Curated annotation (Swiss-Prot):
UniProt cross-references to Pfam families, sorted A to Z: EPSP_synthase (PF00275)
Secretion signal span: none
InterPro entries with a match to the protein in the record: Enolpyruvate_Tfrase_dom, Enolpyruvate_Tfrase_sf, MurA_subfamily, RNA3'P_cycl/enolpyr_Trfase_a/b, UDP_GlcNAc_COvinyl_MurA
Listed name of the protein: UDP-N-acetylglucosamine 1-carboxyvinyltransferase
Protein residues bound to UDP-N-acetyl-alpha-D-glucosamine: R94, D309, V331
Amino acid sequence: MQIAQVFGCGRLNGEVKVSGAKNAATKLLVASLLSDQKCTLRNVPDIGDVSLTVELCKSLGAHVSWDKETEVLEIYTPEIQCTRVPPTFSNVNRIPILLLGALLGRCPEGVYVPTVGGDAIGERTLNFHFEGLKQLGVQISSDSSGYYAKAPRGLKGNYIHLPYPSVGATENLILAAIHAKGRTVIKNVALEAEILDLVLFLQKAGADITTDNDRTIDIFGTGGLGSVDHTILPDKIEAASFGMAAVVSGGRVFVRNAKQELLIPFLKMLRSIGGGFLVSESGIEFFQERPLVGGVVLETDVHPGFLTDWQQPFAVLLSQAQGSSVIHETVHENRLGYLHGLQHMGAECQLFHQCLSTKACRYAIGNFPHSAVIHGATPLWASHLVIPDLRAGFAYVMAALIAEGGGSIIENTHLLDRGYTNWVGKLRSLGAKIQIFDMEQEELTTSPKSLALRDASL
């Protein structure tokens, strides 16, 4: 296995380029399966989740050509050769469940997908997916290893109202509605930028699809789609991540391709605690405008609110901001466990089951912590950390970059590879001191100060 040793290095300075959005690229690859024509995607990020989705599409009959230097990928699926997703894709991420919507139009006789995985940040149940698909004429059954869906009478358009604006359920229903007979109106949809990117892709390919400001998507089923050439939008989570790393280190980093319109709630919160930024046509420069001051309430929400994926790295900023701040996580019920790692480094954090904000969320009666108070500013100390999920991983790297007392040992760095293109190289280019090592599991029981590390990065 690979681990990272990250040293406190002082200020980060320089420039990095934001890659294409993970949460758009993976979904557009699945959407390409709606068409039997060639689809070209540009600005494709070279990350683990995209590679995995490419292999998933290939297993179903897709022909894929991916030039990683130019970031251009061509995918062509003239016919679906397999309607049972191989079990090797079980529990690795949440992409396979979207194949129900994408494939049923071309394979109404039935599709089988294995159980889904992804970050360990809560139950993330599939009820919204299944209930919506059933309203389109889909019959669904399940066993311990996966889900079987079929549409024996074909997909039929319908009026669907989602109980919650779930991103995944919105995507699945859009994909299914493309091949459904008649009109489908989906209410209370998620309207994240990646959803709109999916809509643009489908419209270019020939779909009759529109959106409205009242969280409505309207689709007339058109059957098969044509060829399409589409450039993936930049990753707003990666852009914010490097912006936060710059601010917490006291440095100055220009994040090329960062888009202000994708970052509005993040930039507002960043400025409120003392972070600075300068917006230009080609990107955003991030820096620390004044000593960081807390006393804020950070509440995650669906778009256009503060994204849950920004919350974890932002907690590191709050640990270095003078005063007490509140985090209220309303999107995923189990996304604050990473704070134990920051506590181990010296951060002062308290977890609460109550909703610590002006409004109660859907987890108000849940028996689990989904709010936290962070008291800053406190020095952080190098520690041995195990990454629990992708965004917590970047938070741990940020914390290690400002920690005192040597290098932090960080396990499960493969989770960072899922969502950040060349994260080690990009951080090194800004002055970060990071080494990647191969290590046997039993060696990790040794104190980080006495580890016999074998460098695999040279």
